[in-house]
Design a protein with these regions (language model features):
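N-terminal hydrophobic/helix-forming segments and targeting peptides
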Residues: 1-432
Length: 432
């Protein structure tokens, strides 16, 4: 997959919810010649390239070479991102304004979501032939339908001193003005009618939904020399894009061994779900691959012990207005290349050998790299790398691209860094 910045921006534009991240990524792999498998059917595998949609929000893709046991390599990322989710029964009215009742997903920077036009995307579930056979429909307004207005400075003179926003009160978006004289429709009917109009169904068919509000702002190159990319959802769609580049390269080069790419959901809320990295999903999927090829669990365990995994998630780049917030000797900068993330607490996966392996891969692929370690008095976040490697005891290294304003509604990255990540993933998964 050839890289250029417009291609990344186009990918991010299509990934407006975890469901759409999987759908967009799945289509990319199908276009590249991968064969789709079902999680609910037995697999009869041989050499080739396969992809599985796992519960709609996680994706598992893998390449099997002619020599199955040559080597096992896995790359991972996550499909979710900090966002605003719509609650059930979401409609509430205040003095003629119709608002959505919402909740915060992950650790988003709340004030960055104010005064931004917001679209809505996700899945809507409809009645089927029986309660176990329901229909899921992807949903994306592709236009702004909501906004969370700020309070004017004249009504809050201390706003520039910092204001704590109450998630239940001040973070509710407005979506319409209630029509004059409208008294017949219930709140549920108003919302279901809107959804029904968007997906072309009868409101009575709608049973449930998972809907994310997202900034409709598109990614853009920024700077006098176009050094930066400003975009929503850089955390962690940059990593998804890089992992996909790697697994496509494995197919292209027809490498031996088994190469896997897994894009987990729910990293931003702890990963402890059926489709997250803190469960048995990856070990179970990998065992299904091995058993379908005629190998035992012991064979798989041997390859896991010999294999290697790279977990990709974004890192905190040095902020020019707050340089003191980073470690004094280990700080990544934008356009400085891929970041190797280290923590003695193991909040990031890695040990001395894992670090050495990834440094060696970077040098082989001519990929620039840098080191990130938290300031000793400022704990950072954690990633799915340590979580998933605890469930699948495979040597793992956490890496990612440096960002500014991580978890903001719009984040900033270096315009030259994605190419470095793509090259590393292509070398890791796509070379012997």
């Amino acid at each position: 997959m050839k890289f250029d910045n417009p291609q990344l921006i186009k990918y991010i534009k299509g990934c407006t919810s975890p469901y759409h991240t999987v759908d967009t990524s799945l289509q990319l792999l199908l276009d590249a010649g991968f064969t789709e498998l079902s999680l609910e059917e037995s697999w009869n595998l041989t050499s080739g390239d396969y992809v599985v949609n796992v519960y709609g929000t996680t994706l598992f893709a893998f390449h099997i070479g002619e020599d199955y046991r040559h080597s096992l390599r896995i790359a991972s990322a996550h499909t979710d991102f900090p966002a605003i989710r719509v609650k059930p029964n979401p409609i509430t009215d205040v003095k003629g304004y119709t608002k959505l009742n919402v909740e915060m997903y992950g650790g988003l920077i709340q004030n960055t979501w104010l005064d931004r036009p917001l679209g809505a995307a996700g899945t809507v579930v409809l009645k089927g032939e029986n309660p176990y056979d329901v229909d899921s429909v992807l949903f994306d307004t592709k236009r702004p339908i909501a906004i969370i207005p700020n309070l004017a400075i004249h009504m809050n003179r201390n706003v520039n001193d910092g204001v704590a926003l109450n998630r239940q009160k001040e973070m509710l978006p407005i979506i319409m003005m209630k029509p004059d004289g409208e008294t017949t429709k219930s709140e549920e009917e108003v919302w279901n009618q809107f959804l029904a109009d968007e997906i072309n169904c009868d409101p009575s068919e709608i049973l449930s939904y998972e809907i994310t509000l997202y900034p409709v702002t598109e990614g853009a190159l920024v700077g006098t020399d176009f050094d930066f990319i400003s975009s929503p959802r850089l955390d962690n769609l940059t990593s998804c894009f890089g992992v996909l580049a790697g697994i496509v390269e494995a197919k292209k080069n027809k490498v031996d061994g088994i190469r896997c790419a897994i894009l987990f959901d729910n990293e931003e809320v702890g990963s402890r779900t059926k489709q997250g990295g803190a469960g048995m999903l990856l070990p179970n999927l990998l065992e299904r691959v091995y058993r379908s090829l005629g190998f035992s669990r012991d064979d798989m365990d041997l390859d896991v012990a010999r294999g290697f995994m790279i977990s990709s998630d974004v890192a905190h780049g040095l902020h020019p207005n707050y340089p003191e917030k980073n470690d004094i000797t280990n700080f990544p900068v934008l356009n400085g290349g891929v970041t190797l993330k280290q923590a003695c607490s193991q909040s990031y996966a890695g040990d001395a050998k894992a670090i050495a392996i990834v440094k060696g891969l970077c040098e082989e692929a001519n990929v620039a790299y840098q080191i990130y370690v938290n300031r000793s008095d400022i704990p950072g976040g954690s990633t799915v790398g340590s979580i998933s490697s605890a469930m699948l005891p495979m040597r793992t290294m956490d890496i990612g691209l440096p960002l500014l304003a991580m978890h903001s509604a719009v984040e900033t990255m270096g315009a030259r860094d994605q190419e470095q990540l793509n090259h590393l993933m292509q070398h890791f998964l796509g070379d012997e």
